[in-house]
Structures are given as structure tokens and as C-alpha cells.
Amino acid sequence: MLRLLMIADDFTGALDTGVQLAAHGIPTQVVVGQADLSACSSTVLVVDTETRHLPAAKAAKAVEELTRSAVENGVGCIYKKTDSALRGNIGAELAALLKASGARNLPFLPAFPQIGRTTKKGVHYIDGVPVNESPFGIDPFEPVRCAEVTKLIHLQTEIPAQNLRPGETAADKTGILVYDAATAADLETAGRQLFQNGTPPVLAGCAGFAAFLPELLGLSDGSVVETPQLDPRLLVLCGSVNPITLRQMDTAEKAGFTRLRLTPRQKLEPGYWASADGKAALAEIEQMLAANPHCIIETNDAGGNQLTADYAAARGIDLDGMRVGISGSVGQMFGALFGSEHLGTLLLTGGDTLLQCMNSVGARELEPVCELESGIVLARFTYQGRTRYVITKSGGFGQEDLLVELADRIAKH
């Protein structure tokens, strides 16, 4: 029976939140796009609506339709998963959930203190820095312009939104209620307060608060899923421009990872990987994988992305066209390489990259297994009758030595 519906706006976010329940042995399914809630056999269903880059009205419509379906099918709790750095259509999607559910209010707990993302006096911080002054404020595709959460919400909706401090009750309030949380304990306290009179019909937040849902919903039996043995060879496929991920790759390269940067043509020329030059490049990549146990293939140019920007400008490709074109090309490359005997464990970073790579091998559903580190998810899917594993990561997650530490951990497990 479906007990919990989670609605995410990108693939990596769907996984890093769904795994908070799957890691406790709770049957959890992650799907992209449309979902038949009446036919779902999992206890938890996470739907990635792929609305992060859509216009606000279209994003709201997708969330509203899914919410109405959940209400009609008697789903007890709906959780709107938001980005922990507040990217995407936050106000529009929260308003759509509240409106379609018919609930009196929507408790919103945006913090993820476990990885340094906190909300204090209504302002959202990344490692102590207001989010709009952090790397997320200069994201080329979706910069976060405002750190005051209620103001950010009101950029897209007129529904009332107010900030709640630790200890304040939501019982007599209406609209979107933004909770402060500087620690995981703050989230836990807020959760216990919210659930003391039964399960709230709607909630919103990221993986930080979702970590407490197994206990709050009475779904956890105390079990913990063990990490399966993985192929010690590691290929990192990076489509993220986040400075955090760039530093992780620099650190890994210094530690001995082999690093390949795709050229502007490889990233943006339609059909490149099916061309003679593309096939030759794929053969060279296979040779690289055969000769090196730890490899990185990335979409960033050395020293910035001006080369790719110039290439795109000369061909009339705008910023969104670059984003779609690059992720699509990476997906095509991934599909061509996927059957290689030299391919070991995969780590995909960036939601667009993950989606296109999974599309290329026909995997529209993933099952989260466990977290290797906070925000770093191990998931599995079936390909030609075999279980395959993939590690997924949002571009903004992890310490600088993350890739090196993961490679060591996989090799020793």
C-alpha cells in the first residue's frame, strides 16, 4: 500500500530523498514523469516531475495534477521534495501542492544541517553563507537570488508564507510555514511536534527532514540496508558546473584519477557519437577505461567554459540549449559505452546528466539502496536481465576528497 508520495523536481534529488526511507528497508520506488498511483505496489513512491527548469506555471501544473491524483487514491502523506539550495520553482510548486491538497497549511523545512545547509531566522545558509552569496548564487543555469525563504516563495506565489522559529506550533496557522533549523535535532523536534496529533497530509523539505520520516510515519523496523559489493573500477561522469564538484575532480586528478574533458564539438554537435570521429573517440575512451581503474569524463572546459560558450554562440545555441544539448550528448556517449567490459562502478553527478544517461539505456525507474555518504546515493536498476548499480550525486554535495574516499571505500569493501 502506498503510504507516502514524494514529489521531486530532478532525478538526483528524487534519489537522495527516497534513499532516506529505502536505507531502512522500506520498499521505495523512484520514477520519472507520469506515475499510476493506483497501480503502485511500493510503500513509498518518489516521482521526479523534471520541473526544475520549466516555467513556473508548467511546474505548478505538474505538481497540482500529481497531488490531486494522490488525494483521489487515498495517499496518507505527500512530501514535496525541494532542492536543499532552494533552486527551482520553489514558490510555484509549494503553492500548487497546498492548493490541490486542500490542506490548511504546508509545513516547509528546507534545511539539511547534516551537510551544512541551515535556516536561521528565515534565512537559508550554505556552510554559514547566505545561499545567494554561495556558489549557488552564481549558478549559470539557475542562480538563487534570494536567501530569505519567504521572499523567495513570494517571487512565484501570493499565498501567505511566514517563518516559524524552533518551538512554534503550526496548529493555528495557514499558508506556507517555513521552519528554522540549525541542527538535525531541530528538524527532529519540529517533526515530533508536527506529528503529535497524527500524520500531516502535506509536508515539504529536502533529504534533511526526510531522514526522520521513517520513524515519524512508523515505517521503520530499525533495520539498515548493507552496502553490496561493487566493482572497484570507478568511472565518474560529470555534467555539473558546480564549483564544489570541480574541486572534487581537481583533488581526484591530483590523487591519480585519469581525467578527460569533452570538447565543445563532442558536447554540442548533434549526432556526434554516431559519426566516424565520434566512434574513434569512443574507442579511445574504452582504451582509457581499460588502462586506468579510476577515470573522470567531464563536460567542463579547462579554466572555465568560455570555449564551449563561444562554440555555442557561433551556432546560435542559447544557454538552455547548451544545457539540454550537453546532457543529451553525454547520455548518447553513455549509451554507447554502457556495454563495455571495461566499465566498472559508475558515479553520475548532476540531475540532467543522470536522467539522460538512464534514458539512453531505457532505465526510467531506479531503486535507491543506501547512502555511501550523506547525499551520495547508491541505486540499482535492471538492464537486460542484470542488476546494475550506479552512484548518484548532486553537484553541490560532498567534501573535496569525496571521489578519492569513495574509490578507496569501494576497493576495500
Residue ranges and their predicted role:
Residues L343-L402:
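Conserved, well-ordered active-site substructure
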Residues A23-V44, L289, P368-T387:
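N-terminal short beta-loop-beta anion/metal-coordinating cradle
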Residues T43-E50, P293, R380-H413:
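A structural-propensity feature for long, helix-poor, extended segments
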Residues I7, V46-D48, K80-K81, P107-F112, ...:
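Short beta-strand segments
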Residues M1-L4, P27-V31, T43, A59, ...:
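Cap/lid and interdomain-hinge subdomains that line or gate substrate/regulatory clefts
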Residues T17-V19, N89-E93, R117-H124, E188-Q193, ...:
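Short acidic, glycine/serine/threonine-rich loops at helix termini
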Residues M288, N292-T349:
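C-terminal structural cap/anchor segments
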Residues D127-E284:
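Conserved, well-structured core segments that form the ligand-binding/active-site neighborhood
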